[in-house]
């Protein structure tokens, strides 16, 4: 009788832990970017403003801790895109369903400009946003955006952004990189 009761208690505990895990997954924050725009990266050394909207698609608040943005010029992205050590640290709360705009100044080096101009390489901005959910779990969303020149006037729409979905990835817990 005692063994049966212990077995039932253990099974009930396992079910409760499983339900709690599903609840955390369903209710947690999920942050991504959208509405990306870039100013003019030219001439080299000029800081273009990159505009991103951070969006919380989840069902609870996200506590944004920072982001990393890396300009990268090449014909193709490597399998594992490199992220710079340069990080923007900030403390924001992003409510469920909320969108918040962010501007980051990024520029091309002489070498990157030459690769773009001579080798017809592409301009990418690689990045990640790091945040915590209401359960205290740390998350990181990696992304890559390719900017194609439109020509014409200077301004926020000089380069057309193309989201590189195959480079987007989500990480949690110990997989999250330090800022």
What are these model-predicted stretches?
Residues 80-112:
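Intrinsically disordered, low-complexity Pro/Gly/Ser/Thr-rich segments with frequent PxxP/GP/PP motifs
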Residues 1-70, 127-128, 170-179:
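Membrane-proximal alpha-helical anchors
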Residues 109-151:
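Terminal connector regions
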Residues 71-83, 153-156:
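Short aromatic-acidic-glycine turn motif
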Residues 57-60, 72-77, 132-139:
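Short, cysteine-centered beta-strand-loop-beta hairpins and adjacent loop/turn segments enriched
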Residues 47-51, 99-101, 122-124, 140-142:
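Intrinsic-disorder/low-complexity, polar/charged segments enriched in Ser/Thr/Lys/Arg/Asp/Glu/Gln
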Residues 140-179:
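Acidic, serine/threonine- and proline-rich intrinsically disordered appendage/tail regions
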Residues 42-46, 96, 117-123:
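Solvent-exposed loop and beta-edge segments used for protein-protein assembly and interaction
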């Amino acid at each position: 009788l005692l063994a049966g009761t212990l077995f039932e208690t253990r099974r009930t505990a396992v079910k409760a832990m499983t339900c709690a895990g599903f609840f955390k997954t369903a209710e947690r924050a999920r942050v991504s970017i959208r509405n990306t725009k870039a100013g003019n990266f030219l001439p080299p050394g000029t800081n273009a403003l990159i505009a991103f909207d951070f969006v919380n698609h989840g069902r609870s608040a996200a506590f944004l801790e920072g982001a990393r943005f890396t300009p990268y010029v090449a014909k193709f992205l490597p399998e594992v895109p490199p992220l710079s050590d340069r990080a923007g640290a900030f403390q924001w709360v992003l409510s469920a369903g909320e969108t918040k705009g962010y501007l980051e100044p990024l520029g091309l080096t002489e070498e990157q400009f030459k690769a773009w101009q001579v080798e017809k390489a592409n301009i990418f901005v690689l990045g990640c946003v790091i945040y915590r959910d209401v359960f205290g779990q740390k998350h990181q969303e990696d992304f890559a955006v390719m900017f194609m020149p439109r020509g014409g006037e200077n301004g926020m729409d000089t380069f057309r952004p193309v989201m590189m979905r195959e480079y987007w990835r989500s990480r949690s817990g110990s997989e999250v990189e330090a800022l």
